[in-house]
Amino acid sequence: MSLNLELDPLTLRKVFAQHPSGVAALCAELDGEKTGIVASSFTVGVSLEPALVMFAVQKSSNTWPKLRDAGRIGVSVLSERNEGVCAQIASKNGDRFRGIETTGTDQGALFVDDSTLWLEASIYNEVEAGDHWVVLLEVHGHRTSGHLPQIFHDSQFHSLPVPELV
């Protein structure tokens, strides 16, 4: 097998888009203002003791420096019921949370309603990785809904088929 050796950013984006992933919204309320980012790089099960998850964020992000200051971050793994939420929270214009139902905690974590999984977390460690930060989060609480997750593959959102009972 011969491999393509082109490693420029545009080519890599297309190649990496072939890996299906869930999408997480990482949000908090700081001084009365809702802030958040979305990450298709979100990964669970990094560690069970302590309970750690992780995601990667571009160093050029304008939102991460604000979110980094939150005591607690709400991680919402988006479900098929959250259509359009990812694009809206990732938007650079307007009110990123207009029309999005959210629930907050006393510690400032902010969750997107109707998601498939919610985790309340705090920053455990942050590691420089090229043009990104890899952020490890310690999980302090969790809840699941039973909704099917939204899947990001080939730069498009997909839903899993509903399992049929035999």
Regions found by a protein language model. Give the residues of each.
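Basic, polyanion-binding surface patches
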Residues: M1-V166
